[in-house]
Amino acid sequence: MSGNTFGKLFTVTTAGESHGPALVAIVDGCPPGLELDLQDLQRDLDRRKPGTSRHTTQRQEADEVEILSGVFEGKTTGASIGLLIRNTDQKSKDYSAIKDLFRPAHADYTYHHKYGIRDYRGGGRSSARETAMRVAAGAIAKKYLATQGIVIRGYMSQLGPIQIPFKTWDSVEDNAFFCPDPDKVPELEAYMDQLRRDQDSVGAKITVVAEGVMPGLGEPIFDRLDAELAHALMSINAVKGVEIGAGFDCVAQRGTEHRDEMTPQGFLSNQAGGILGGISSGQPIIAHLALKPTSSITTPGRSIDVDGNAADVITKGRHDPCVGIRATPIAEAMMAIVLLDHLLRHRGQNADVSVATPVLAQL
């Protein structure tokens, strides 16, 4: 299986399955001398880990990360950083009844046709369990970016039919939904409680924002910053769409509304989401991602078995009724990985570039 590595100068390679003994990652390209300890990684892993509320899977994983290499006396050495998270709460017997069946809207059918063999236990490699390593690697990127004044934060902007207006970052970490409007939390909880009674699942929309990004990151033509962000965010399990800035809303906008006019005091808007011509403009980088409803639900669904016979599938096991609830730290991680990769690439080619034009203030 190829496609397990992301990035060019700052690279992340992951391995491991949902019900295997462990998940691992190799992070290459981290600059030396960065102060780094386990808590830097564990902080974000705890935000993503399962079993933290009644609205997520009840699989209990501590997700305690181990740093195997690349850090000495509390600082990165420039060598590859090896990371490991042990799986401790697998219940593979929950999946024995569907080992010869294909769950609708899941990767079972496509993995079977591509590889001729699949790990049916919890989805194997296709499980979102893999994203724990992305979060750990992304935490390293976030730590370095912070030394450059770059801060990445995300929040839930929609759950099912419920639109969530942004009010304050202060409430995002105070609830299970990463909700920026504390007044919306009771409505979200009631919706999820009913969803669980209905034995169903629902999608969500996540917004992730990077502030403090300098102008100049991005490598046209094929490595545009927005293209690589879309690639990174689309690679997250269950993501079916990515928007940068105004996104698809630009279709209904006129040029006079969409263009981000400039004054000596700064930009007057940020419809572009902080990226112009594939290069960061110095404005906040804003991305939105849409996640589909969880495929694995207990409501019976029509499918086939490996011999092509009709079958009804009832998925047991422990699953998130809304994968978007835990997706915010994953989206932050992938944005951080992309930005650090492009920061290092920009430094390698353009470190000596200097212009007299001032950097415009952010909105």
UniProtKB/Swiss-Prot annotation:
Which GO cellular component does the record give, naming just one? cytosol
What EC designation does it have?
4.2.3.5
Binding residues for NADP(+), per the UniProt record? Answer: R48, R54
Q: Name one GO biological process term.
A: chorismate biosynthetic process
What pathway is this protein a component of? Metabolic intermediate biosynthesis; chorismate biosynthesis; chorismate from D-erythrose 4-phosphate and phosphoenolpyruvate: step 7/7
Question: Cofactor binding mode, per the note?
Answer: Reduced FMN (FMNH(2)).
Give the reaction(s) catalysed.
5-O-(1-carboxyvinyl)-3-phosphoshikimate = chorismate + phosphate
Q: Which cofactor does it need?
A: FMNH2
What UniProt keywords apply to this chain's record, in alphabetical order? Answer: Amino-acid biosynthesis, Aromatic amino acid biosynthesis, FAD, Flavoprotein, FMN, Lyase, NADP
Q: Which CDD domains match?
A: Chorismate_synthase (cd07304)
SUPFAM superfamilies in the cross-refs: Chorismate synthase, AroC
Q: Kindly give the InterPro entries that the UniProt entry links to this protein.
A: Chorismate_synth (IPR000453), Chorismate_synth_AroC_sf (IPR035904), Chorismate_synthase_CS (IPR020541)
Q: Does the keyword Flavoprotein apply?
A: yes
SS bonds (residue pairs): none
Q: Which one of the record's GO molecular function terms can you name?
A: FMN binding
Q: Which residues bind FMN?
A: R125, S126, S127, N237, A238, G277, K292, P293, T294, S295, S296, R318
The UniProt subunit note reads as follows: Homotetramer.
Cited PANTHER family: CHORISMATE SYNTHASE
Give the family, as the similarity comment puts it: Belongs to the chorismate synthase family.
Job description of the protein? This reaction introduces a second double bond into the aromatic ring system.
UniProt cross-references to HAMAP family, sorted A to Z: Chorismate_synth
Protein name, as recorded: Chorismate synthase
This chain's source organism reads: Pseudomonas syringae pv. tomato (strain ATCC BAA-871 / DC3000)
Highest lineage ranks of the organism?
Bacteria, Pseudomonadati, Pseudomonadota, Gammaproteobacteria, Pseudomonadales
Q: Which gene encodes it?
A: aroC
